[in-house]
Amino acid sequence: MVEQDPYEIVIKQLERAAQYMEISEEALEFLKRPQRIVEVTIPVEMDDGSVKVFTGFRVQHNWARGPTKGGIRWHPEETLSTVKALAAWMTWKTAVMDLPYGGGKGGIIVDPKKLSDREKERLARGYIRAIYDVISPYEDIPAPDVYTNPQIMAWMMDEYETISRRKTPAFGIITGKPLSIGGSLGRIEATARGASYTIREAAKVLGWDTLKGKTIAIQGYGNAGYYLAKIMSEDFGMKVVAVSDSKGGIYNPDGLNADEVLKWKNEHGSVKDFPGATNITNEELLELEVDVLAPAAIEEVITKKNADNIKAKIVAEVANGPVTPEADEILFEKGILQIPDFLCNAGGVTVSYFEWVQNITGYYWTIEEVRERLDKKMTKAFYDVYNIAKEKNIHMRDAAYVVAVQRVYQAMLDRGWVKH
Protein backbone atom coordinates (compact mmCIF):
# COMPACT_ATOMS: atom_id res chain seq x y z
CA MET A 1 0.00 0.00 0.00
CA VAL A 2 0.96 3.65 -0.39
CA GLU A 3 2.93 4.86 2.62
CA GLN A 4 2.89 8.61 1.98
CA ASP A 5 -0.11 10.69 2.98
CA PRO A 6 -1.96 11.18 -0.34
CA TYR A 7 -2.65 14.87 0.22
CA GLU A 8 1.03 15.53 1.04
CA ILE A 9 1.85 14.17 -2.43
CA VAL A 10 -0.64 16.62 -3.99
CA ILE A 11 1.05 19.57 -2.26
CA LYS A 12 4.54 18.40 -3.31
CA GLN A 13 3.45 18.01 -6.95
CA LEU A 14 1.85 21.46 -6.92
CA GLU A 15 4.99 23.08 -5.47
CA ARG A 16 7.11 21.29 -8.07
CA ALA A 17 4.91 22.57 -10.93
CA ALA A 18 5.09 26.11 -9.51
CA GLN A 19 8.86 26.15 -10.19
CA TYR A 20 8.17 26.07 -13.94
CA MET A 21 5.62 28.89 -14.06
CA GLU A 22 4.80 32.31 -12.69
CA ILE A 23 2.21 32.02 -9.95
CA SER A 24 1.62 34.16 -6.87
CA GLU A 25 2.19 32.80 -3.35
CA GLU A 26 -1.44 33.48 -2.40
CA ALA A 27 -2.74 31.51 -5.40
CA LEU A 28 -0.49 28.60 -4.48
CA GLU A 29 -1.76 28.75 -0.89
CA PHE A 30 -5.37 28.78 -2.21
CA LEU A 31 -4.77 25.75 -4.46
CA LYS A 32 -3.30 23.76 -1.58
CA ARG A 33 -6.66 23.85 0.19
CA PRO A 34 -10.00 22.36 -0.90
CA GLN A 35 -12.76 24.97 -1.20
CA ARG A 36 -15.29 22.77 0.59
CA ILE A 37 -15.12 19.61 2.68
CA VAL A 38 -18.34 17.89 3.76
CA GLU A 39 -18.41 14.96 6.18
CA VAL A 40 -21.76 13.25 6.69
CA THR A 41 -23.26 10.53 8.88
CA ILE A 42 -25.57 8.08 7.12
CA PRO A 43 -27.81 5.75 9.17
CA VAL A 44 -28.87 2.71 7.14
CA GLU A 45 -31.45 0.10 8.09
CA MET A 46 -29.96 -3.33 7.44
CA ASP A 47 -31.94 -6.33 6.18
CA ASP A 48 -32.08 -7.81 9.70
CA GLY A 49 -33.80 -4.67 11.03
CA SER A 50 -30.73 -3.26 12.81
CA VAL A 51 -29.32 0.18 11.94
CA LYS A 52 -25.70 0.71 10.91
CA VAL A 53 -24.11 4.16 10.80
CA PHE A 54 -21.73 5.01 7.95
CA THR A 55 -19.41 7.99 7.42
CA GLY A 56 -19.32 9.69 4.02
CA PHE A 57 -17.33 12.54 2.48
CA ARG A 58 -17.67 14.97 -0.41
CA VAL A 59 -14.72 17.22 -1.21
CA GLN A 60 -14.90 20.09 -3.72
CA HIS A 61 -11.30 21.10 -4.34
CA ASN A 62 -11.66 24.07 -6.69
CA TRP A 63 -14.56 25.49 -8.70
CA ALA A 64 -12.83 28.41 -10.44
CA ARG A 65 -13.41 26.80 -13.88
CA GLY A 66 -16.92 25.47 -13.28
CA PRO A 67 -18.96 22.91 -11.31
CA THR A 68 -16.86 20.31 -9.52
CA LYS A 69 -16.78 16.80 -10.97
CA GLY A 70 -15.60 13.48 -9.62
CA GLY A 71 -16.47 9.96 -8.59
CA ILE A 72 -17.90 8.39 -5.45
CA ARG A 73 -15.78 5.63 -3.90
CA TRP A 74 -17.05 2.93 -1.53
CA HIS A 75 -14.07 1.46 0.29
CA PRO A 76 -13.52 -0.10 3.74
CA GLU A 77 -10.29 1.91 4.16
CA GLU A 78 -11.52 5.20 2.70
CA THR A 79 -9.91 8.27 4.31
CA LEU A 80 -10.59 11.98 4.06
CA SER A 81 -6.97 12.53 2.96
CA THR A 82 -7.43 10.18 -0.02
CA VAL A 83 -10.69 11.86 -1.04
CA LYS A 84 -9.04 15.31 -0.78
CA ALA A 85 -6.10 14.16 -2.92
CA LEU A 86 -8.36 12.62 -5.58
CA ALA A 87 -10.50 15.79 -5.67
CA ALA A 88 -7.37 17.87 -6.34
CA TRP A 89 -6.28 15.47 -9.08
CA MET A 90 -9.72 15.89 -10.67
CA THR A 91 -9.11 19.66 -10.72
CA TRP A 92 -5.91 19.08 -12.72
CA LYS A 93 -7.45 16.37 -14.91
CA THR A 94 -10.44 18.48 -15.98
CA ALA A 95 -8.16 21.50 -16.53
CA VAL A 96 -5.62 19.63 -18.66
CA MET A 97 -8.54 18.40 -20.82
CA ASP A 98 -9.93 21.97 -20.89
CA LEU A 99 -13.33 20.84 -19.58
CA PRO A 100 -15.50 23.54 -17.90
CA TYR A 101 -15.22 21.86 -14.51
CA GLY A 102 -13.34 21.88 -11.23
CA GLY A 103 -12.35 18.84 -9.20
CA GLY A 104 -14.48 16.93 -6.70
CA LYS A 105 -14.54 13.49 -5.08
CA GLY A 106 -16.75 11.53 -2.72
CA GLY A 107 -16.32 8.50 -0.54
CA ILE A 108 -18.05 6.29 2.00
CA ILE A 109 -16.20 4.10 4.51
CA VAL A 110 -17.88 0.77 3.75
CA ASP A 111 -17.09 -2.74 2.55
CA PRO A 112 -19.73 -3.11 -0.19
CA LYS A 113 -19.04 -6.85 -0.45
CA LYS A 114 -20.74 -7.22 2.94
CA LEU A 115 -23.94 -5.43 1.84
CA SER A 116 -26.99 -6.88 0.07
CA ASP A 117 -28.33 -5.03 -2.99
CA ARG A 118 -31.16 -3.58 -0.89
CA GLU A 119 -28.68 -2.32 1.71
CA LYS A 120 -26.54 -0.78 -1.05
CA GLU A 121 -29.59 1.03 -2.40
CA ARG A 122 -30.48 2.42 1.03
CA LEU A 123 -26.86 3.58 1.53
CA ALA A 124 -26.77 5.21 -1.93
CA ARG A 125 -30.02 7.09 -1.32
CA GLY A 126 -28.97 8.07 2.22
CA TYR A 127 -25.70 9.53 0.91
CA ILE A 128 -27.55 11.71 -1.62
CA ARG A 129 -29.96 12.94 1.06
CA ALA A 130 -26.94 13.86 3.21
CA ILE A 131 -25.03 15.79 0.50
CA TYR A 132 -28.09 17.10 -1.39
CA ASP A 133 -27.42 20.75 -0.50
CA VAL A 134 -23.92 20.79 -2.05
CA ILE A 135 -24.59 18.99 -5.35
CA SER A 136 -26.56 19.90 -8.49
CA PRO A 137 -26.06 19.67 -12.28
CA TYR A 138 -24.52 23.15 -12.07
CA GLU A 139 -22.57 22.84 -8.81
CA ASP A 140 -21.08 19.37 -8.28
CA ILE A 141 -21.64 16.31 -10.47
CA PRO A 142 -20.72 12.88 -9.03
CA ALA A 143 -19.91 9.71 -11.01
CA PRO A 144 -18.99 6.05 -10.37
CA ASP A 145 -15.58 5.12 -8.98
CA VAL A 146 -14.14 2.31 -6.82
CA TYR A 147 -16.88 -0.27 -6.04
CA THR A 148 -19.67 1.92 -7.42
CA ASN A 149 -21.40 1.34 -10.77
CA PRO A 150 -24.21 2.53 -13.09
CA GLN A 151 -26.87 0.86 -10.90
CA ILE A 152 -25.72 2.80 -7.83
CA MET A 153 -25.67 6.01 -9.92
CA ALA A 154 -29.26 5.27 -11.03
CA TRP A 155 -30.46 5.01 -7.42
CA MET A 156 -28.63 8.20 -6.54
CA MET A 157 -30.09 10.10 -9.48
CA ASP A 158 -33.57 8.84 -8.64
CA GLU A 159 -33.19 10.02 -5.03
CA TYR A 160 -32.00 13.45 -6.20
CA GLU A 161 -35.00 13.75 -8.56
CA THR A 162 -37.38 12.68 -5.79
CA ILE A 163 -36.10 15.41 -3.45
CA SER A 164 -35.76 18.14 -6.11
CA ARG A 165 -39.06 17.29 -7.87
CA ARG A 166 -37.35 17.99 -11.20
CA LYS A 167 -36.96 15.71 -14.16
CA THR A 168 -34.83 15.93 -17.32
CA PRO A 169 -32.04 18.36 -16.31
CA ALA A 170 -31.70 16.35 -13.11
CA PHE A 171 -30.37 13.57 -15.39
CA GLY A 172 -27.22 15.71 -15.47
CA ILE A 173 -26.79 15.52 -11.69
CA ILE A 174 -24.76 12.31 -12.03
CA THR A 175 -22.81 10.72 -14.88
CA GLY A 176 -21.95 7.09 -15.56
CA LYS A 177 -25.67 6.22 -15.54
CA PRO A 178 -27.32 3.32 -17.38
CA LEU A 179 -28.19 4.13 -21.03
CA SER A 180 -31.92 3.86 -20.26
CA ILE A 181 -31.79 6.94 -18.02
CA GLY A 182 -29.46 9.38 -19.70
CA GLY A 183 -26.18 7.49 -19.89
CA SER A 184 -23.87 8.08 -22.86
CA LEU A 185 -22.76 5.64 -25.52
CA GLY A 186 -19.02 4.98 -25.32
CA ARG A 187 -18.76 5.55 -21.56
CA ILE A 188 -17.72 1.99 -20.71
CA GLU A 189 -14.75 2.02 -23.11
CA ALA A 190 -13.93 5.71 -22.59
CA THR A 191 -10.81 5.44 -20.41
CA ALA A 192 -9.14 2.94 -22.75
CA ARG A 193 -10.34 4.71 -25.91
CA GLY A 194 -8.92 8.02 -24.67
CA ALA A 195 -5.62 6.34 -23.74
CA SER A 196 -5.40 4.80 -27.23
CA TYR A 197 -5.51 8.25 -28.86
CA THR A 198 -2.66 9.49 -26.64
CA ILE A 199 -0.59 6.39 -27.49
CA ARG A 200 -1.20 7.06 -31.20
CA GLU A 201 0.03 10.66 -30.86
CA ALA A 202 3.02 9.64 -28.71
CA ALA A 203 4.04 7.22 -31.48
CA LYS A 204 3.85 10.07 -34.02
CA VAL A 205 6.13 12.38 -32.01
CA LEU A 206 8.63 9.50 -31.71
CA GLY A 207 8.61 9.29 -35.51
CA TRP A 208 6.85 5.93 -35.84
CA ASP A 209 4.97 5.66 -39.16
CA THR A 210 2.38 3.30 -37.75
CA LEU A 211 1.43 1.30 -34.67
CA LYS A 212 0.69 -1.73 -36.85
CA GLY A 213 2.85 -4.65 -35.73
CA LYS A 214 4.24 -2.77 -32.72
CA THR A 215 4.06 -4.57 -29.37
CA ILE A 216 2.24 -3.60 -26.17
CA ALA A 217 2.16 -5.12 -22.66
CA ILE A 218 -0.78 -4.25 -20.39
CA GLN A 219 -0.66 -4.68 -16.62
CA GLY A 220 -4.21 -5.09 -15.32
CA TYR A 221 -7.13 -6.74 -17.09
CA GLY A 222 -10.13 -4.99 -15.62
CA ASN A 223 -12.36 -2.69 -17.66
CA ALA A 224 -9.56 -0.38 -18.86
CA GLY A 225 -7.02 -3.14 -19.49
CA TYR A 226 -9.42 -5.30 -21.50
CA TYR A 227 -10.73 -2.44 -23.66
CA LEU A 228 -7.19 -1.15 -24.25
CA ALA A 229 -6.09 -4.61 -25.44
CA LYS A 230 -9.13 -4.83 -27.73
CA ILE A 231 -8.78 -1.31 -29.17
CA MET A 232 -4.99 -1.39 -29.68
CA SER A 233 -5.15 -4.76 -31.47
CA GLU A 234 -8.38 -4.37 -33.46
CA ASP A 235 -8.26 -0.65 -34.34
CA PHE A 236 -4.52 0.02 -34.45
CA GLY A 237 -3.11 -3.38 -35.45
CA MET A 238 -0.79 -3.64 -32.45
CA LYS A 239 0.34 -6.96 -31.03
CA VAL A 240 -0.81 -7.39 -27.43
CA VAL A 241 2.00 -9.70 -26.28
CA ALA A 242 1.32 -9.68 -22.53
CA VAL A 243 -1.50 -8.95 -20.07
CA SER A 244 -1.90 -9.61 -16.35
CA ASP A 245 -4.24 -9.39 -13.38
CA SER A 246 -3.64 -9.48 -9.61
CA LYS A 247 -2.84 -13.22 -9.71
CA GLY A 248 -0.21 -13.05 -12.47
CA GLY A 249 0.26 -12.57 -16.20
CA ILE A 250 0.65 -14.27 -19.58
CA TYR A 251 3.00 -13.73 -22.50
CA ASN A 252 2.75 -14.72 -26.16
CA PRO A 253 5.15 -13.03 -28.63
CA ASP A 254 2.69 -13.72 -31.48
CA GLY A 255 -0.06 -11.69 -29.76
CA LEU A 256 -3.12 -12.43 -27.63
CA ASN A 257 -6.80 -12.20 -28.55
CA ALA A 258 -8.44 -9.75 -26.12
CA ASP A 259 -11.89 -11.38 -26.14
CA GLU A 260 -10.58 -14.93 -25.73
CA VAL A 261 -8.41 -13.85 -22.79
CA LEU A 262 -11.39 -12.12 -21.15
CA LYS A 263 -13.53 -15.25 -21.60
CA TRP A 264 -10.75 -17.34 -19.99
CA LYS A 265 -10.41 -14.87 -17.10
CA ASN A 266 -14.17 -14.88 -16.45
CA GLU A 267 -14.25 -18.69 -16.46
CA HIS A 268 -11.07 -19.33 -14.45
CA GLY A 269 -10.78 -16.25 -12.24
CA SER A 270 -7.48 -15.15 -13.78
CA VAL A 271 -5.72 -14.75 -17.13
CA LYS A 272 -3.08 -17.24 -15.91
CA ASP A 273 -2.67 -20.58 -17.72
CA PHE A 274 -4.27 -19.17 -20.90
CA PRO A 275 -3.71 -21.77 -23.67
CA GLY A 276 -0.74 -21.02 -25.94
CA ALA A 277 0.78 -18.43 -23.59
CA THR A 278 3.58 -18.57 -21.03
CA ASN A 279 2.81 -17.60 -17.44
CA ILE A 280 4.80 -14.59 -16.19
CA THR A 281 4.74 -12.45 -13.06
CA ASN A 282 3.49 -8.86 -12.92
CA GLU A 283 7.08 -7.76 -12.28
CA GLU A 284 8.32 -9.59 -15.39
CA LEU A 285 5.57 -8.03 -17.52
CA LEU A 286 6.79 -4.52 -16.69
CA GLU A 287 10.33 -5.31 -17.87
CA LEU A 288 9.45 -6.96 -21.19
CA GLU A 289 11.07 -5.89 -24.45
CA VAL A 290 8.00 -4.10 -25.88
CA ASP A 291 7.29 -0.84 -27.71
CA VAL A 292 4.51 0.32 -25.37
CA LEU A 293 3.94 -0.47 -21.70
CA ALA A 294 0.54 0.33 -20.19
CA PRO A 295 0.25 -0.02 -16.40
CA ALA A 296 -3.55 -0.20 -16.00
CA ALA A 297 -3.93 -1.70 -12.52
CA ILE A 298 -2.67 -0.20 -9.26
CA GLU A 299 -0.44 2.64 -8.11
CA GLU A 300 3.34 2.63 -7.60
CA VAL A 301 4.34 -0.39 -9.72
CA ILE A 302 7.27 1.33 -11.46
CA THR A 303 9.68 2.45 -8.74
CA LYS A 304 13.38 3.32 -8.43
CA LYS A 305 13.96 -0.45 -7.98
CA ASN A 306 12.78 -1.48 -11.47
CA ALA A 307 12.66 1.75 -13.52
CA ASP A 308 16.11 1.12 -14.97
CA ASN A 309 14.90 -2.21 -16.38
CA ILE A 310 11.94 -0.74 -18.29
CA LYS A 311 12.55 -1.33 -22.00
CA ALA A 312 9.38 0.16 -23.53
CA LYS A 313 9.70 3.40 -25.49
CA ILE A 314 6.27 4.68 -24.41
CA VAL A 315 4.82 4.27 -20.91
CA ALA A 316 1.08 5.00 -20.97
CA GLU A 317 -0.22 5.50 -17.43
CA VAL A 318 -3.76 4.15 -17.67
CA ALA A 319 -3.85 3.55 -13.89
CA ASN A 320 -3.64 6.38 -11.36
CA GLY A 321 -0.13 6.97 -10.03
CA PRO A 322 1.59 3.82 -11.36
CA VAL A 323 5.04 5.50 -11.48
CA THR A 324 6.75 6.98 -8.40
CA PRO A 325 8.46 10.42 -8.57
CA GLU A 326 11.92 8.76 -8.29
CA ALA A 327 11.08 6.44 -11.19
CA ASP A 328 9.85 9.44 -13.24
CA GLU A 329 13.39 10.85 -13.15
CA ILE A 330 14.94 7.56 -14.25
CA LEU A 331 12.51 7.07 -17.17
CA PHE A 332 13.07 10.69 -18.26
CA GLU A 333 16.87 10.18 -18.25
CA LYS A 334 16.39 7.01 -20.33
CA GLY A 335 14.46 9.00 -22.94
CA ILE A 336 11.22 7.07 -22.43
CA LEU A 337 8.10 9.04 -23.37
CA GLN A 338 5.67 8.92 -20.46
CA ILE A 339 2.00 9.82 -20.89
CA PRO A 340 1.07 10.95 -17.36
CA ASP A 341 -1.99 9.45 -15.71
CA PHE A 342 -4.23 12.50 -15.54
CA LEU A 343 -3.78 13.02 -19.29
CA CYS A 344 -3.66 9.35 -20.35
CA ASN A 345 -6.74 8.18 -18.43
CA ALA A 346 -8.82 11.36 -18.84
CA GLY A 347 -11.07 9.73 -21.46
CA GLY A 348 -13.39 8.64 -18.64
CA VAL A 349 -14.09 12.12 -17.29
CA THR A 350 -14.24 13.53 -20.83
CA VAL A 351 -17.05 11.16 -21.83
CA SER A 352 -18.69 11.91 -18.46
CA TYR A 353 -18.62 15.56 -19.57
CA PHE A 354 -20.17 14.52 -22.91
CA GLU A 355 -22.90 12.65 -20.97
CA TRP A 356 -23.64 15.79 -18.93
CA VAL A 357 -23.78 17.93 -22.10
CA GLN A 358 -26.20 15.46 -23.70
CA ASN A 359 -28.35 15.46 -20.52
CA ILE A 360 -28.49 19.26 -20.31
CA THR A 361 -29.33 19.70 -24.01
CA GLY A 362 -31.58 16.65 -24.29
CA TYR A 363 -29.86 15.67 -27.56
CA TYR A 364 -28.00 12.35 -27.68
CA TRP A 365 -25.02 11.46 -29.88
CA THR A 366 -24.09 8.34 -31.83
CA ILE A 367 -21.09 6.24 -30.74
CA GLU A 368 -19.20 7.65 -33.76
CA GLU A 369 -19.84 11.23 -32.60
CA VAL A 370 -18.69 10.39 -29.06
CA ARG A 371 -15.46 8.81 -30.34
CA GLU A 372 -14.75 11.61 -32.80
CA ARG A 373 -15.19 14.30 -30.13
CA LEU A 374 -13.11 12.31 -27.65
CA ASP A 375 -10.34 11.96 -30.25
CA LYS A 376 -10.25 15.74 -30.78
CA LYS A 377 -10.16 16.46 -27.03
CA MET A 378 -7.46 13.87 -26.22
CA THR A 379 -5.29 14.88 -29.19
CA LYS A 380 -5.41 18.58 -28.35
CA ALA A 381 -4.63 17.88 -24.67
CA PHE A 382 -1.70 15.64 -25.64
CA TYR A 383 -0.06 18.41 -27.69
CA ASP A 384 -0.86 21.11 -25.11
CA VAL A 385 1.25 19.06 -22.69
CA TYR A 386 3.88 17.76 -25.12
CA ASN A 387 4.67 21.24 -26.48
CA ILE A 388 5.27 22.63 -22.96
CA ALA A 389 7.45 19.61 -22.10
CA LYS A 390 9.55 20.21 -25.22
CA GLU A 391 9.74 23.97 -24.84
CA LYS A 392 10.87 23.82 -21.18
CA ASN A 393 12.73 20.49 -21.51
CA ILE A 394 10.76 19.05 -18.61
CA HIS A 395 9.02 15.79 -17.84
CA MET A 396 5.57 15.22 -19.39
CA ARG A 397 4.04 15.01 -15.90
CA ASP A 398 5.49 18.38 -14.89
CA ALA A 399 4.27 19.83 -18.19
CA ALA A 400 0.75 18.48 -17.58
CA TYR A 401 0.73 20.15 -14.16
CA VAL A 402 1.93 23.43 -15.67
CA VAL A 403 -0.89 23.37 -18.27
CA ALA A 404 -3.53 22.47 -15.66
CA VAL A 405 -2.42 24.81 -12.86
CA GLN A 406 -1.99 27.70 -15.30
CA ARG A 407 -5.60 27.30 -16.49
CA VAL A 408 -7.02 27.17 -12.96
CA TYR A 409 -4.82 30.12 -11.88
CA GLN A 410 -6.05 32.19 -14.83
CA ALA A 411 -9.69 31.51 -13.89
CA MET A 412 -8.96 32.53 -10.29
CA LEU A 413 -7.29 35.75 -11.48
CA ASP A 414 -10.18 36.61 -13.80
CA ARG A 415 -12.68 36.09 -10.96
CA GLY A 416 -10.65 38.38 -8.71
CA TRP A 417 -10.06 35.63 -6.12
CA VAL A 418 -6.28 36.19 -6.17
CA LYS A 419 -3.80 38.77 -7.47
CA HIS A 420 -0.76 38.39 -9.72
From Swiss-Prot:
Pfam families: ELFV_dehydrog (PF00208), ELFV_dehydrog_N (PF02812). NAD(+) binds at residues 220-226. Belongs to the Glu/Leu/Phe/Val dehydrogenases family. It comes from the Archaea. The keyword Oxidoreductase applies. Keywords: Cytoplasm, NAD, NADP, Oxidoreductase. Its EC number is 1.4.1.3. Homohexamer. One of its GO terms (biological process) is glutamate catabolic process. It is found in: Cytoplasm. This is Glutamate dehydrogenase. It catalyses: L-glutamate + NAD(+) + H2O = 2-oxoglutarate + NH4(+) + NADH + H(+); L-glutamate + NADP(+) + H2O = 2-oxoglutarate + NH4(+) + NADPH + H(+). One of its GO terms (molecular function) is glutamate dehydrogenase (NADP+) activity. The active site is at 105. GO terms for cellular component: cytoplasm.
